[in-house]
Amino acid sequence: PEKVDVLISGTGPAGLCLAAQLSQFQDIETMIVERMPSNIIKGKADGINTRTMEMFQAFGFADKVKRETYWVNQTAFWMPDPQNPEHIKRVGRVQDVADDSSEMPHILINQARLHELFLEYMKNSPSRLEPDYGWEVVDLSIDHTTDDHTVTVTLKDASGINWWATRTIRANYVVGCDGAHSKVRKAIGGELHGDAAHQAWGVMDILANTDFPDVRQKCLISSANEGNVLVLPREGGYIFRMYVELDKLRPDEKASQRKLTQDDMIAAANRIIKPYSIDVKEVVWWSIYDIGHSITDRFDDVAEGEDRNPRVFTAGDACHTHSPKAGQGMNVSMQDTFNLGWKLVHVLKGRANPRLLRSYSKERLTEAKRLVETDHKWSRIMSAPTTQAERDGTQEPRIIRQFKENLEFTGGTAVKYDASYLFAASAHQALAAGEEIGRRFHSAPVVRVSDAKQMHLGHVAEADARWRIYAFAGKSDTSNPGSKIHQLADWLETNTNSPVVQFTPKGEDIDAVIDFRAVFQQTFDQVAYENMPSLLKPKTGKLGLQDHEKVFCVDHKGLGDIFDMRGINREKGCMIVVRPDQYVSHVLPLDGFEELSAFFAGVLQVNSAGKRV
């Protein structure tokens, strides 16, 4: 196509996560280009934290990922043996995912497999979106005098298949997910600022025999004088990955200049893990790199002091880089575009004013800064020599203390967005103390009333750019006519001030923009489904079939009571408003109609024709 709504550069995790979201909307013309001639086959990143797994649930492939992958259940720590400092000794083990921090595991997966899952999702989507391989962005310009396909992008054939031809595409929005050397970032004047650790590291995926006892656990190994190793087992029971600390570099030197090889890496690993050894049978993939921590000062094309809406964005390594040791790179990259995706959908479908897009850089830049700071600290601790107190066992090693402190951060669940018009003030936070405004909606077990299915409430949220309102009924409420839940549902469905009435385009399903669900405190056999208000039993789709899956009750079978687990007020109940990217925007009493109306009036706009903006 010569004109598109969104052009994405790069088919790494960030680019594919964005393309997958946009692929669900047939009326949004999306193009994704990649300079490589095809998808990657092996290597690259592998760690997926619990928050990213929650996102995968929204794409519908979390269960598949859980089945296929290695689960990181605990981390073992090895340090120099005080009796023989040339040898290492296990000094502790830590549970890797804290209890009830997430229902999801921390897993390790081949990045190429992850790409396949996104590509399959896109191929089966309403738009049947597929990448254009072999093309890279070489230049772009923005015409601020028009609102129609403002960005002109020059693409060049990077593989030679098309005789190095160029082509021009005009786009409403461009997103650079094209890595640390991003052409998109350079085109909008963005620069990565940061520092290098002047330290060469190697990474290898290997098939090997070893007498090291913890080879099927994640391990952090610190030797007295030879450096550090990080061991990550991989799916399938045999292959494992080793990150190996190699040579110190001069300030003006790159790791590539050292001409280090896989044999250097294997030799270094054997020196570090003495008295154990590894006998490598096959190196499946390897790479040498130097650690750097860097970040851009903005994630869009709007310079400081400019007052306009952005047209070009960067995400992932294009705007922040860090060491692989914290296992965050791939996760934060996808979380960048999970934040951006629904905002682009809202603007392109006329649901929200384009100013919504300003929030992307603001929200994600803050998180990227925090990531780089934490990674800096972690890298220093990992490379620091052990103290005497740590070696003789009188003090818990700093690396273990820091690891425990970081658990929420490394799980991806520590993100808390600052107050803005997308997050209401916390006046009613006490009604749901465990669902903090600005943080991700923390799922908990429930039972679906229509079929008595035990499940997680958060799993109803799909990557479909819809808002959710979860209404939690008070103690005596069984949704008989006149109850608080009935009153709320009736108001949402019929009142002219209701955001459902105001912002659902004519001719679309009543839950096309805002998806309303309810949770009751009784057991499922005590809840009269037939008495539910019609908004909880809507007729949707082409054939107008009834949706039976919007009513839930607490799980009395022992998996946990959502009211107790998330500090929800049993007497009064409450409603929780959740953004399309699963972050809590508002907590309100069940009769907080005016506040609910005012909140959505500040975010959404009336556009019954669904006209492009």
Spans of model-derived segments:
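Core beta-strand elements of the Rossmann-like FAD/NAD(P) dinucleotide-binding domain
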Residues: 2-4, 161-173, 177, 308
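N-terminal Rossmann-like FAD-binding beta1-loop-alpha1 element of flavoenzymes
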Residues: 2-33, 37
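Conserved mid-domain beta->alpha element of the FAD-binding
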Residues: 11-20, 118, 176, 283, ...
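Active-site-adjacent segment of FAD-dependent monooxygenases/related oxidoreductases
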Residues: 41-128, 132, 143-145, 232, ...
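A conserved short coil-to-beta-strand element within the FAD-binding core of flavoproteins
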Residues: 133-151
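C-terminal helical "tail/cap" subdomain of flavin- and related membrane-associated enzymes
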Residues: 301-305, 345-506, 522-524, 572-574, ...
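Conserved FAD-binding catalytic core of PHBH/FMO-like flavoproteins
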Residues: 67, 120, 173-291
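FAD-binding beta-loop-beta segment adjacent to the flavin cofactor pocket
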Residues: 290-314, 318, 439-465, 533-570
